[in-house]
Amino acid sequence: MEEYEKFRALASKEAEKRGYLFQEAQHAYSAGNKAKAHELSQEGKLCGERMENYNRQAASAIYLYKNSQCNPDEIDLHGLYIDEAVQAVQQRIENCIRRGDNHLHIIVGRGNHSANHVEKLRPAIVRMLEQQSIKYNSEVNEGRIYVYLPSATSPIQPNFNCIQEPQEAYSRPQHSTLTDQVEPEKIVEEIATNCFPRLKTCCAIM
């Protein structure tokens, strides 16, 4: 968590500096000093690149921390910005389908940390699932989404009423899947290394 907070703080500083430099570049351009405006603009772009790099490192750190504690059929998106979370879920779904898994629990939270407690992450994930025609259902505690993966010919309806606490294990499908044989740490590392290096922008956090 300390590493995550450190990188987010560094990214925030670079974002502030970038905003200041772009503003000064506009002032210089308005004053007719195009050379100075270009110089300031280039410095601002460098700040933006550093900001993105810090955010990628923060996303990777929090993802590894949260998901190393999850079951193989879960993905925890706490701490990720919206676009980071969407990319992580897309990558995870692709990996699950390749392994022949038939479901995935997506932990999206309840929006308690969002401005005015308005959920932003769940709608973004749901929109992505609907765009890809992937079936899903909300779970009892409202902080999770159960996804029926396309690889499953007959997805098993989960008994949502039996879910008590987030840390309790979920019932497995009646047939075994490759996920049961894959170490959770390997799944987490696969997502973090393949997904987060592709991030380009960062949006509101959940």
UniProtKB/Swiss-Prot annotation:
Q: Which residue range or ranges hold the Smr domain?
A: 75-150
Q: Which GO molecular function, any one, fits this protein according to its record?
A: endonuclease activity
Q: Where does the UniProt annotation locate this protein?
A: Cytoplasm; Nucleus
GO biological process, alphabetically ordered: DNA repair
User: What cellular component GO annotations does this protein have?
Assistant: cytosol; nucleus
Q: SMART domains from the xrefs?
A: DUF1771 (SM01162), SMR (SM00463)
Principal location listed in the UniProt entry: cytoplasm
Q: Which UniProt keywords apply?
A: Cytoplasm, Nucleus
UniProt-listed PROSITE patterns: SMR
InterPro entries the UniProt entry points to: DUF1771 (IPR013899), Smr_dom (IPR002625), Smr_dom_sf (IPR036063), Smr_domain_protein (IPR053020)
Concerning PANTHER family, the annotation shows:
SMR DOMAIN-CONTAINING PROTEIN YPL199C (PTHR47417:SF1)
What is the recorded name of this protein?
A: Smr domain-containing protein C11H11.03c
- The organism's lineage? Eukaryota, Fungi, Dikarya, Ascomycota, Taphrinomycotina
